[in-house]
Amino acid sequence: MLDLENIIVIGVSHENLSLLERENFMRTRPKYIIERLYTEKKINAYINLSTCLRTEFYIELNSNIKAKEIKNLFSVDMIVKSRVEAIEYLFKVGCGFYSVIKGEDQILAQVKGAYAEALENEHSSKFLNIIFNKSIELGKKFRTKSMIAHNALSLEAISLKFIKSKFPNIEDKNIFILGIGELAQDILTLLTKEQLKNIYIANRTYHKAEQIKKEFDIVNIVDYREKYPKMIEADVIISATSAPHIVVEYDKFVAQMKENKDYLFIDLAVPRDVDERLANFKNIEIYNLDDIWEVYHLNSMNRDKLLEDYSYLIDEQMEKLIKTLNYYK
């Protein structure tokens, strides 16, 4: 039986925890904790939506554990929603209500990715399948009708704006990218359109860097173990790795850096890749995800109006979902 009583969402995001708090939370290995509950059959199913701004678990409960008990497994302030409220929350997440850039497309792709991963690893359920399919369907419809994503700024586009504010003429600048995940590749796509001649990438797994080289012939591969000599020659260092620790270490960078050269770091990792003490140097600037959130939150008023005007689509989708669930009773 598909019972709304069994649906909860639990997690953290940039809206309820700071970057530092989210970093500490990720070090507790939350996915392992939820996976253990699933393995022990204390929950029926789960889907993990994990991005640079949020880590959330959409869970179908059973009689073996309560939402409060799951929350108590974690030591941080968690988002906990249940029943209709949990589903409405997912719908709004998929539509971009809680994104840094309201209505941006990337979150919908991430919802799709989370759902696909759950299907592949066989820890979803019929109930969660219905809910996530409805969310993805709504996300597409919402953007089409509201046109909220028209000329939308993505994280990578925002990063480029920060770079251009520091270096208006970036064509002759050296760009060094650490990590080649999805976000780093999106940034690389934008940078290649700027007629840059000097782009370097370093990744812990070398063959993955070689694959990127095939797609972006303009890039130069740097051995990850030899990253510092090339990094200190760069004007802009973009770091977006998935490492659980500092990647750009204070002592190693300071020992080799040029004091008469300006450096701009764009740190898009959670936990952060760049030792924040480097910002104490006058010739070094560091922007991280919280900086992006702070700056662009001020420019979201127009998008907020669109969210309000088209929120009726969420109500309509919820009605359709209830009808679907009633059909299976």
From Swiss-Prot:
Chain ranges passing through the membrane: none
Domain of life according to the entry: Bacteria
PROSITE patterns in the cross-refs: GLUTR
Record's keyword terms, sorted: NADP, Oxidoreductase, Porphyrin biosynthesis
Record EC number: 1.2.1.70
The keyword Nucleotidyltransferase appears for this protein: no
GO molecular function: glutamyl-tRNA reductase activity; NADP binding
Record-listed NADP(+) binding positions: 179-184
Domain remark text: Possesses an unusual extended V-shaped dimeric structure with each monomer consisting of three distinct domains arranged along a curved 'spinal' alpha-helix. The N-terminal catalytic domain specifically recognizes the glutamate moiety of the substrate. The second domain is the NADPH-binding domain, and the third C-terminal domain is responsible for dimerization.
Family recorded in the similarity comment: Belongs to the glutamyl-tRNA reductase family.
Assembly behavior: Homodimer.
Listed PANTHER family: GLUTAMYL-TRNA REDUCTASE 1, CHLOROPLASTIC
NCBIfam families given in the database record: hemA
Protein task: Catalyzes the NADPH-dependent reduction of glutamyl-tRNA(Glu) to glutamate 1-semialdehyde (GSA).
HAMAP family: Glu_tRNA_reductase
Designated name of the protein: Glutamyl-tRNA reductase
